[in-house]
């Protein structure tokens, strides 16, 4: 389906579409972004860094992308990395090389994006080790994301635009590295080696570093079709997520505007990507978590191990109050429900439809969510039960071909969220996607 020219009633359409994760990440955003990139002129990243990850298959070849948007795999597509990102340039160059072709000719990097150095990764590891000893581990990817955003917020970070003038970059680099080595008592760090690498990056990237704000708005005025790719997901947002067990950037719709420099009236449509069950990596509250055989079944059948870290993901039942909270923040217009096939084989499927206070019995107010760890401990899930199905659904091409119990589960989710579920993932391959044409919103 061409997202820029869809025929769904009561849903806006236009030239700017954002695809955002609606849970704790790992929803399977890569597949839908890959499918929709075919219809876009420009694909963008606006937040995060190499702590995100997609594995995309094109013409039977797999590509692991952590910094580049999925549109890089299409020769007619321009790719943009926005100012809200933190970019480990060595990792970026390795990704560019792995994709091959004349990718650099259609890649644009914001001059306001911040550079993530190896020392940020060292600091990340130091901080996480210290927190582990204190029993306060966050469970970061140790990719240096938090420390880089920290230097940005402290106003001592270095932007990509600085790399265009290498002498100026060298001076700023030395001051930053010396400051961080002193602050974190780092005694050994090969500055000369890193500077030599950055001189090569300066030569290769100086013409690709641009004012992305001007670039984006000029292209929007020329009616270019833009697909915006969110990294991580809503419940990892630095403000709205389960703080402090979150990432360091704005992962919700507000990050689109602050991370690309386009204004809110330009965004026409938001697609929320929702896994048919729930997972999270690392620490933090998880009210529907399954520490049992069912949780292990979902982990193994769904291959729930981190793309970036390879860590096993925690698994649990789908959480409607969470999705209603995320919908409030992001104004989600459509949903892509992923990995429905993983639920095949379960005798019973539970859907969390509310939370009840353990002491008072009071139900959670619609649109609210207990993101604080101490508050989340006061609540317990209220479940609606559904019968499972045994059939292999990976060969289903239409909604009506799904088992009755699978259809009931999908329609219940749609009813609670009052948002059309347009795409349903029924298998790992690109073709394993049902496009649903009728919706249950009453």
Swiss-Prot record:
Pfam families for the chain: Adenylsucc_synt
Binding site for substrate: 307-313
EC numbers for this chain: 6.3.4.4
Main EC class the enzyme belongs to: ligase
Localization terms from the record: Cytoplasm
Gene3D superfamilies: Adenylosuccinate Synthetase, subunit A, domain 1, Adenylosuccinate Synthetase, subunit A, domain 2, Adenylosuccinate Synthetase, subunit A, domain 3
Biological processes, Gene Ontology terms: 'de novo' AMP biosynthetic process; AMP biosynthetic process; IMP metabolic process; purine nucleotide biosynthetic process
Positions that bind Mg(2+): 26, 53
Transmembrane segments: none
Cofactor note: Binds 1 Mg(2+) ion per subunit.
Presence of the UniProt keyword Ligase in the record: yes
Catalysed conversion reaction: IMP + L-aspartate + GTP = N(6)-(1,2-dicarboxyethyl)-AMP + GDP + phosphate + 2 H(+)
InterPro entries hit by this protein: Adenylosuccin_syn_GTP-bd (IPR018220), Adenylosuccin_syn_Lys_AS (IPR033128), Adenylosuccinate_synth_dom1 (IPR042109), Adenylosuccinate_synth_dom2 (IPR042110), Adenylosuccinate_synth_dom3 (IPR042111), Adenylosuccinate_synthetase (IPR001114), P-loop_NTPase (IPR027417)
Keyword check for rRNA-binding: no
Record-listed IMP binding positions: 26-29, 51-54, 141, 155, 232, 247, 311
Sites where the protein binds GTP: 25-31, 53-55, 62, 307, 313, 339-341, 425-427
Active site residues of this protein: 26, 54
Similarity annotation: Belongs to the adenylosuccinate synthetase family.
Job of this protein: Plays an important role in the salvage pathway for purine nucleotide biosynthesis. Catalyzes the first committed step in the biosynthesis of AMP from IMP.
Note: Parasitic protozoa lack the de novo purine biosynthesis pathway and rely exclusively on the salvage pathway for their purine nucleotide requirements.
Record note on quaternary structure: Homodimer.
Protein name: Adenylosuccinate synthetase
Species of origin: Plasmodium falciparum (isolate 3D7)
Gene field: Adss
